[in-house]
Amino acid sequence: MKASMYLALAGLVLLFVVGYASESEEKEFPRELLSKIFAVDDFKGEERGCKGFGDSCTPGKNERCPNYACSSKHKWCKVYLGK
């Protein structure tokens, strides 16, 4: 029982030492990760300038993207193939 406790304690100490060593080598990683996360959140509030395939639309008012057509049956954008 004592041996398993010492082994578990040694494992935790080893995990702590390895974690500390890797953290000291990559101090910029958490800052870069947080800046990327917050940069992605900035784009959520912006409206897309152009409707894409599968986006909902109003038939007859698809002036945003000429290469897509608004399906009057399904009310979503589909690829315009021409007539």
Curated annotation (Swiss-Prot):
One matching Pfam family, short form?
A: Toxin_12
- Subcellular location per the Swiss-Prot or TrEMBL entry: Secreted
- Leucine amide, modified sites: L81
Tissue localization of expression: Expressed by the venom gland.
Q: Name one GO cellular component term.
A: host cell presynaptic membrane
List keywords of the entry alphabetically. Amidation, Disulfide bond, Ion channel impairing toxin, Knottin, Neurotoxin, Presynaptic neurotoxin, Secreted, Signal, Toxin, Voltage-gated sodium channel impairing toxin
Propeptide residues are: 22-48
Tell me one GO molecular function of this protein: toxin activity
Q: Which InterPro entries match?
A: Huwentoxin-1
Signal peptide residues on this chain, from the entry's feature table: 1-21
Can you quote the domain comment? The presence of a 'disulfide through disulfide knot' structurally defines this protein as a knottin.
Q: How does it assemble?
A: Monomer.
Sequence similarity:
Belongs to the neurotoxin 10 (Hwtx-1) family. 15 (Hntx-3) subfamily.
* Function comment: Lethal neurotoxin. Selectively blocks tetrodotoxin-sensitive voltage-gated sodium channels (Nav). Does not affect tetrodotoxin-resistant voltage-gated sodium channels or calcium channels.
Q: What is this protein called?
A: Mu-theraphotoxin-Hhn2g
Look up and give the organism this protein is from. Answer: Cyriopagopus hainanus
